[in-house]
Amino acid sequence: MCLRYLDIPGINDDTDYLKIVNKYGDTIYRKPHFRALEELGVSAKFIQTADSDDVKKQIDLGLPVVAGILHHGAVSDPSGGGHFVVITGYGRDYWLVQDPYGELDLVNGGWAATGAVAGRNIRYSFKNLNPRFFVGGEGSGWCWYDFKRVK
């Protein structure tokens, strides 16, 4: 999603990107992503201390943010190995999210609907997404941000 935003040649969906990442290792680790981005001529930063203001600042600059979330379990006690979504906007009380896997059931965990179309332009309330993103409270979010072309 972020690479399409930058109009990187040969990247039409996350499948194209994952083929490159898989050359360098498991997708759950940062290093293969950094190496894949480098191959594609893109730089990005990864932090584990993001808060809502950090995300909003990137969005206000016109840059999407890839947010790590826990997608299993109830919103009151999220769990799971993790999943990443792309935040492309926000409103007074929601994040605008893109997810090629589908639409999340934020209250109960899991998926409300699967498929790329199901995950387009979903408005997730701060109330229900933030506990899955900022699991340890504000300032504990894992995200990729500041995507730039370097070639």
Predicted regions mapped to residue ranges:
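Generic structural signal for short, flexible, solvent-exposed coil/loop and linker residues
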Residues: 26, 31-35, 44, 54-56, ...
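Noncatalytic regulatory segments and standalone regulatory/sensor domains
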Residues: 24, 60, 78, 90-151
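Alpha-helix initiation/capping motif
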Residues: 29-32, 51, 70-72, 125
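Cysteine-nucleophile protease catalytic domains, especially the papain-like/related folds used
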Residues: 1-47, 138-148
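Extracytoplasmic/secreted proteins, especially bacterial periplasmic and envelope-associated proteins
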Residues: 1, 32-39, 54, 82, ...
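Active-site-adjacent substructure of cysteine-protease-like catalytic cores
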Residues: 47-107
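Sec/Tat-exported extracytoplasmic proteins
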Residues: 2-7, 38-41, 59, 63, ...
